[in-house]
C-alpha cells in the first residue's frame, strides 16, 4: 500500500457538494492499494502512521505521534498514487490494485487505523471527491508498506 500523509490543521472531503468526512488537527491520509498487499501489511502501515512522530512537542520538535496528540485522520482513496510516468506524457495506473481489491484494502486500512485508537473519517471509494486541507508545516510524507 502506498500512502501520502499530510499533517493538517483541518481537512474535509466532499462528494456531490456534501461533506462526507472531516478532521480537525491531525492527518490527511491518501492511500492506494497495490497488488501483493495483505491485511497484515496494511495493518502494519496503519500502526506506523498512528505512531509516526511528526507532531511538535513543547520545544517545537517533531517528537509526538498522532496518538500522542489525540489527532484524527481523514482517509481518502487515491489510485493515482500508483501512477507510472516513465513513458510518454499520460500516466498509467495499472500498478494499482484492481478496483474490488483496492476497495477492500482501503476499508481494511481505515479499520486498522481506527483500531489503533485514532478517530478516523473517510472519503468514498471510487467517487469523484473534492478534498480541502490546511497543511500544517507543511509536513508531507510518502510511505509504503
From Swiss-Prot:
This is D-aminoacyl-tRNA deacylase. Homodimer. NCBIfam families: D-aminoacyl-tRNA deacylase (TIGR00256). It is found in: Cytoplasm. Pfam families: Tyr_Deacylase. Its EC number is 3.1.1.96. The lineage of its organism: Bacteria, Pseudomonadati, Pseudomonadota, Alphaproteobacteria, Rhodobacterales. An aminoacyl-tRNA editing enzyme that deacylates mischarged D-aminoacyl-tRNAs. Also deacylates mischarged glycyl-tRNA(Ala), protecting cells against glycine mischarging by AlaRS. Acts via tRNA-based rather than protein-based catalysis; rejects L-amino acids rather than detecting D-amino acids in the active site. By recycling D-aminoacyl-tRNA to D-amino acids and free tRNA molecules, this enzyme counteracts the toxicity associated with the formation of D-aminoacyl-tRNA entities in vivo and helps enforce protein L-homochirality. A Gly-cisPro motif from one monomer fits into the active site of the other monomer to allow specific chiral rejection of L-amino acids. It comes from the Bacteria. Disulfide bonds: none annotated. GO terms for cellular component: cytoplasm. PANTHER family: D-AMINOACYL-TRNA DEACYLASE 1 (PTHR10472:SF5), D-TYROSYL-TRNA TYR DEACYLASE (PTHR10472).
Amino acid at each position: 500500500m502506498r500512502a501520502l500523509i499530510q499533517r493538517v490543521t483541518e481537512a474535509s472531503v466532499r462528494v456531490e457538494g456534501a461533506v462526507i468526512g472531516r478532521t480537525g488537527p491531525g492527518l490527511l491520509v491518501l492511500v492506494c492499494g497495490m497488488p501483493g498487499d495483505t491485511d497484515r501489511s496494511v495493518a502494519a502501515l496503519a500502526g506506523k502512521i498512528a505512531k509516526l512522530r511528526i507532531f511538535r512537542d513543547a520545544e517545537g520538535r517533531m517528537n509526538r505521534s498522532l496518538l500522542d496528540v489525540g489527532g484524527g485522520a481523514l482517509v481518502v482513496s487515491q489510485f493515482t498514487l500508483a501512477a507510472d510516468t516513465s513513458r510518454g506524457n499520460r500516466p498509467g495506473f495499472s500498478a494499482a490494485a484492481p478496483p474490488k481489491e483496492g476497495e477492500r484494502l482501503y476499508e481494511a486500512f481505515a479499520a486498522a487505523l481506527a483500531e489503533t485508537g485514532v478517530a478516523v473519517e473517510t472519503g468514498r471509494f471510487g467517487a469523484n471527491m473534492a478534498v480541502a486541507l490546511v497543511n500544517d508545516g507543511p509536513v508531507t510524507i510518502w510511505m509504503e508498506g
